[in-house]
Amino acid sequence: VSLGIRNKGYVTLNSSTITAYTAVDGDQIFANTTANPITVTLPASPAVGSEVTFIDARGTFNSNNLIVNRNSQPINTGTSNLTLTTNGQAFTLVYVDATRGWAFKTNTA
């Protein structure tokens, strides 16, 4: 019996020192885009149920965007990367399957 417990990794990305990062399943990413945009690449071969959470740590997605690179997997069946422009946004993507790809599990702004 699986209890569904995930080993979460908390990652703080500061755009003054890093502008690109590749996420792993379970990451909770606090993105500080004060200085520059940040691109986060989703896992290339995710398992069904894989999750990645994104949080606008400084409320600056409008001035310096967070770009989510889909890494060849669809996002809500789409073939475009996500560009986040809403200050204070926080959301979780969960991997569904090869057709739907990554889907929003939660999305707040």
Describe each model-derived feature in a short phrase.
Residues 79-84:
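Beta-strand-rich interaction surfaces with strong enrichment in secreted/lumenal proteins
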Residues 26, 71, 86-90:
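Tight coil/turn sites that cap or link beta-strands
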Residues 1-70, 98-109:
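Exposed extracellular interaction/assembly regions and N-terminal maturation sites
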Residues 69-78:
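Short edge-strand/loop segments of extracellular domains
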Residues 86-101:
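Extracellular disulfide-bonded cysteine-rich modules/repeats
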